[in-house]
Amino acid sequence: MGILGLSKLIADLAPLAIRESEIKNFFGRKVAIDASMCLYQFLIAVRSEGAQLAAVNGDPTSHLMGMFYRTIRLLDNGIKPVYVFDGAPPDMKSGELAKRAERRDEAEKALKAATEAGDEAQIEKFNRRLVRVTKEHSREAKELLKLMGVPYVDAPCEAEAQCAALVKAGKVYATATEDMDALTFGSCKLLRYLTYSEARKMPVKEFSYDKVLQGLELTSKEFIDLCILMGCDYCESIRGVGPKRAIELIKSYRDIETILENIDTNKYAVPENWNYKRARELFIEPDVTDASTIDLKWTDPDEDGLVQFLCGDRQFNEERVRNGAKKLLKSKQAQTQVRLDSFFKTLPSSPNAIAAAKRKAEESKKSANSKKAKIGGGSGAGRGRRPK
């Protein structure tokens, strides 16, 4: 789930914290990628005639196709990816996992009804909702990455937390995920849309943690409390408190304890036995492997091993796999250049620049609303996954 409404809140109140870039602008960067998020995207998006790609025995191969070609694209653009896989979820996430199980049950019932009605659009819709990443998908992805010469890390718990630890330790430049809670875990940089297909033409969105805090005028601890109020994976939120009210409360009272002492409980329903303190602890001190003990190495691809793994029963085209392996080797050999900005120190933004960016964001928002009013808006426009 991530943090509900956080990306929009940052765009509205801390616009300088977001920068849009082309993928090529991350040349020379090492990036920790949320592997489970990627595999889910590939299982959903990589399809043929509406169905997942599959091996001879019917097992899906969409995740392998996506992982192979998107990783080649990253390396081709000079990016050195390291994939981080989820471990066991924390106990505090059991409530969120139970909700997801309920939604899957509902989707299964809806799929059955759509199948009986012969509604192809609804069948595809609910089939996608039932997609989930299994241990076998992850195992196969790790085997593929090993053959490609790309490192991966098994997180003891949450992948986003482990990615953030790698960033904070200077092992990588950024965390790449669609879940905004990478910022709550303290990742200095967060990249969204990095692993999206080229055809979607989505610029990469880069969030800067320091500029988020600066723009929202919060400390790191206050930011964590804000995220808990907005809605996270580890506990319920206060009913009636959305992003706007959450930031108002944090700025007024600075922490959840003081908010609870002053909030009108008749107006805002505080969850019974609300375990926000444990959620806070999970963000401040998550269960991660010490980044200093992790050695990241990118090695030459095993071309014959890739052919053996992907072709045959998995039905990949051998010529394309061999061409992909050659691209991997060429990219590795080319990655000896150094980014120019590694020689220079980046200066922090001035308060005047931040204020100017906020004014510009407000003007853009007003202009967009004005245009919507003139042309009538259209509820079908801009469909897609809602940012978290």
Swiss-Prot record:
Free-text comment on the cofactor: Binds 2 magnesium ions per subunit. They probably participate in the reaction catalyzed by the enzyme. May bind an additional third magnesium ion after substrate binding.
Disulphides: none
Record keyword Plastid present: no
GO process annotations (BP): base-excision repair; DNA replication, removal of RNA primer
Protein localization: Nucleus, Nucleolus; Nucleus, Nucleoplasm; Mitochondrion
PROSITE patterns given in the database record: XPG_1, XPG_2
Broadest EC class assigned to this enzyme: hydrolase
Keyword DNA damage assigned: yes
Keywords, comma-separated and alphabetical: DNA damage, DNA repair, DNA replication, Endonuclease, Exonuclease, Hydrolase, Magnesium, Metal-binding, Mitochondrion, Nuclease, Nucleus, Phosphoprotein
Region (N-domain): 1-104
SMART domains from the UniProt entry: HhH2, XPGI, XPGN
CDD domains recorded: H3TH_FEN1-Euk, PIN_FEN1
Pfam families to which the protein is assigned, alphabetical: XPG_I, XPG_N
EC number: 3.1.-.-
Residues binding Mg(2+) 2, per UniProt: D179, D181, D233
GO-annotated molecular function: 5'-3' exonuclease activity; 5'-flap endonuclease activity; DNA binding; magnesium ion binding; manganese ion binding; RNA-DNA hybrid ribonuclease activity
Segments for region (I-domain): 122-253
Quaternary structure note: Interacts with PCNA. Three molecules of FEN1 bind to one PCNA trimer with each molecule binding to one PCNA monomer. PCNA stimulates the nuclease activity without altering cleavage specificity.
Protein name: Flap endonuclease 1
Source organism of the structure: Drosophila grimshawi
